[in-house]
């Protein structure tokens, strides 16, 4: 049985890891400032997954509920608008075309059109309020876990888990993913 004390200590350890990473990022930014490189350096902070910390009785990362699949992307790019906060759906595949476009001084690079991701520069720069808000993810591990896939399009999320009913959620109206819409007409 998992006790409340176990849950508290696990969450405390997780938040401690976040604080540790935050401190290290602060040191990197200070070094960039001390060497006068901050104004010409793009910084992206992302994670490949979140963590289930007892929500729904689940632990770790092997699912696609929001606690595990929804992670922030923080970008600091010289010349870009500051303080933009958005719930637009992005994906790690969007980073490569974004970085290529930054490296080319924001000139459109024809080769990025062939990449799976989409440059976030129009959005980050404030020129566009919307991008193709789709994210696709999958998880497969040999062992007790079964293949799982997720498609997120705007406020809707579809989760497929082999051998289990599909799950479809409207995250705008059901942010805790409690009402499965997959059988609704």
PLM features: residue spans?
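A long, amphipathic alpha-helix that forms part
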Residues: 2-41, 102
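Active-site rim elements
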Residues: 3-16, 60, 80-90, 103-111, ...
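Beta-strand elements within well-structured catalytic alpha/beta cores of enzymes
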Residues: 18-21, 25, 42-47, 73-75, ...
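Generic, ordered loop/turn and secondary-structure boundary motif
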Residues: 21, 38, 53-54, 59-60, ...
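Histidine-centered active-site microenvironments of extracellular/periplasmic hydrolases
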Residues: 31-84, 88-91
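C-terminal cap/loop subdomain of S1 sulfatases and analogous C-terminal strand-loop tails that border
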Residues: 49-55, 93-96, 101-171, 176
């Amino acid at each position: 049985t998992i006790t409340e004390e176990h849950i508290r200590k696990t969450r405390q350890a997780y938040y401690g890891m976040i604080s540790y990473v935050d401190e290290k990022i602060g040191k990197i930014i200070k070094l960039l400032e001390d060497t006068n490189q901050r104004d010409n350096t793009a910084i992206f902070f992302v994670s490949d997954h979140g963590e289930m910390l007892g929500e729904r009785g689940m632990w770790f990362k092997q699912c696609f509920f929001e606690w595990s699949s929804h992670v922030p992307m923080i970008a600091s790019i010289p010349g870009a608008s500051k303080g933009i906060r958005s719930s637009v759906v992005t994906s790690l595949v969007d980073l490569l075309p974004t970085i290529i476009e930054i490296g080319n001084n924001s000139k459109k690079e024809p080769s990025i059109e062939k990449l799976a991701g989409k440059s976030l520069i129009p959005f980050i720069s404030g020129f566009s309020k919307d991008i193709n808000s789709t994210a696709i993810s999958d998880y497969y591990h040999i062992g007790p876990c079964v293949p799982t896939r997720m498609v997120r399009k705007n406020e809707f999320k579809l989760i497929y888990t082999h051998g289990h009913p599909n799950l479809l959620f409207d995250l705008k109206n059901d942010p805790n993913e409690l009402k499965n819409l997959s059988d609704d007409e």
